[in-house]
A protein has these predicted regions:
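N-terminally biased helix-coil "hinge/interface" segments that flank
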Residues: 1-217
C-alpha cells in the first residue's frame, strides 16, 4: 500500500492504492519511488536490509529512506516518526478488518489465537495481537505460501443454499425435508462430476436463522 499526504488535509494516509510487485516499493529498485508500507518496515529495521529476499533480491534501504522522507517532509516530522506513522495507520486498518470478522460477528478476539500469514503478515502480526488482545500469535512455516498450501491440500467441497422469507412455524416439515434433499443433490452434482464417488460424500446442513425484527443471522 502506498502512503501519501493529501494536499488539502496534510494528514497522512495509507492505501488503498498499491505499488504492486512492479514497480513495487522503492526498496525493490524496479522503478518505484513512492513510499509504501514495505519501505516503512525497512526504514524501521523490521524488514532487514542486509538480507536478500528469496535469496537473490537485494533490498535498497537508501531508496526506502528517500521515499519515506517525502512523507516526513509533507507532515513536518522526522524520518523514523514518519515510518512509524505509516505502520501505525496500516495496523489500525488491518485491525478494523479483524473486527469485521470477529467482534461484529459476535466473536470475542480474546478467545482466539491470531495466525499471521501472507508475505508481510508476520511483520504486523504481533501489533495486531496487541490491538485485538489475541494470543498467542502464531507464525506458520512459509507464511507467504500458506494460502496456496491450503488450496492445494483442502478437501473438495461445494455448497447450495435457499432462503425462506417466512416464520419458522409456517414452513411445513414435508417442504423443509424436500428442500434439504434438493439442496443435497445440487451440492453433490459438481463433486460427482469431478470424480468424487457418492459413497465418499459427506453432507452437512446448517441453518442461519433470526428472531422477528433481527437484522442479521
Amino acid at each position: 500500500s502506498i502512503a501519501f499526504v493529501p494536499e488539502l488535509t496534510k494528514a497522512l494516509r495509507v492505501g488503498p492504492e498499491s505499488a504492486g510487485a512492479v514497480p513495487g516499493p522503492a526498496a525493490y529498485m524496479k522503478g518505484g519511488d513512492l513510499p509504501t508500507v514495505c519501505d516503512a518496515n525497512i526504514v524501521l529495521g523490521l524488514l532487514p536490509s542486509d538480507v536478500q529476499l528469496g535469496g537473490d533480491m537485494v533490498i535498497d534501504k537508501g531508496a526506502a529512506e528517500q521515499a519515506v522522507q517525502k512523507i516526513a517532509d509533507g507532515i513536518g516530522v522526522g524520518l523514523m516518526e514518519a515510518a512509524e506513522g505509516i505502520i501505525k495507520i496500516v495496523n489500525e486498518s488491518m485491525f478494523g478488518a479483524l473486527r469485521l470478522v470477529s467482534v461484529e460477528q459476535g466473536f470475542d478476539p480474546r478467545d482466539f489465537a491470531l495466525v499471521g500469514f501472507g508475505g508481510a503478515g508476520p511483520l504486523h502480526a504481533n501489533a495486531l495481537g496487541i490491538l485485538s488482545n489475541s494470543f498467542p500469535v502464531i507464525i506458520p512455516p512459509g507464511p507467504g505460501v500458506l494460502c496456496a498450501y491450503g488450496d492445494a491440500t483442502t478437501q473438495i467441497q461445494d455448497e447450495a443454499s435457499r432462503s425462506y422469507l417466512a416464520m419458522a412455524q409456517d414452513i411445513t416439515t414435508d417442504k423443509f425435508l424436500a428442500d434439504l434433499h434438493d439442496l443435497k443433490d445440487k451440492a453433490s452434482e459438481s463433486l460427482i462430476k469431478d470424480g468424487v464417488s457418492d459413497s465418499n460424500l459427506e453432507i452437512t446442513y446448517q441453518a442461519d436463522v433470526r428472531y422477528a425484527g433481527q437484522a442479521f443471522q
